[in-house]
Amino acid sequence: MAANDSSNAIDIDGNLDSDSNLNTDGDEATDNDSSKALVTIPAPAVCLFRFAGDAAGGAVMGSIFGYGSGLFKKKGFKGSFADAGQSAKTFAVLSGVHSLVVCLLKQIRGKDDAINVGVAGCCTGLALSFPGAPQALLQSCLTFGAFSFILEGLNKRQTALAHSVSLRHQTGLFQDHHRALPLSLALPIPEEIKGAFSSFCKSLAKPRKF
């Protein structure tokens, strides 16, 4: 009898172990399937998608601007399409190249500062002036890079200033909310001053005799 009980216990333990192994294998298979279902996009692909979206948006805005500029110059509805195409190309390069370089530098350097924007501006100037003389390329790179760097620095400074002002305002509201008793309650006015002030008000209220 004892041998039979021990053999039954061993069989039950073996079944439990096999069930747990099957459950573990099933969980691992489910995790693998879910990991395969979730497609992770690497950083360069994200930058490329951002480049495509910004370039398309810039092309749309440039075409609208160029077509309106052609109408303003009285080139007619058909003659304005040339200006629309040229402006669309320029705006697409401006938006797309700038966004792509900023995204790549952010992934490489791990920072989001004015240096990234300045380098992106330089690359944008090179793309707009290409092909051209080396002097024109250098001038365009320096112009766009310096302009982008200065604008980004001013934008960062303005954002920091606005944040500090909001913090001061919140601190002032907190102090006003937790302020002690008002001055009129903390320092009561003496009765003599109250009587003199009331008599003065009554004298002003009396009608004058002419």
Curated annotation (Swiss-Prot):
One of its GO terms (biological process) is protein targeting to chloroplast. It is found in: Plastid, Chloroplast outer membrane. The keyword Protein transport applies. Disruption phenotype: Impaired import of CEQORH in chloroplast inner membranes. InterPro entries: TIM22. Expressed in young cotyledons, roots, leaves and flowers. Pfam families: Tim17. GO terms for molecular function: protein homodimerization activity. One of its GO terms (cellular component) is chloroplast envelope. It comes from the Eukaryota. The chain crosses the membrane at residues 37-53, 88-105, 114-130, 137-154. It is a multi-pass membrane protein. Residues 1-34 are annotated as: Disordered. Keywords: Chloroplast, Membrane, Plastid, Plastid outer membrane, Protein transport, Transmembrane, Transmembrane helix, Transport. Together with HP30-1 and HP30-2, triggers the import and insertion of transit sequence-less multi-pass transmembrane proteins (e.g. CEQORH) into the chloroplastic inner membrane. Belongs to the Tim17/Tim22/Tim23 family. Homodimer. Probable component of a protein-conducting channel made of HP30-1, HP30-2 and HP20 that mediates the import of transit sequence-less proteins into the chloroplastic inner membrane. Interacts with CEQORH. This is Chloroplastic import inner membrane translocase subunit TIM22-2. It comes from Arabidopsis thaliana (Mouse-ear cress). The lineage of its organism: Eukaryota, Viridiplantae, Streptophyta, Embryophyta, Tracheophyta.
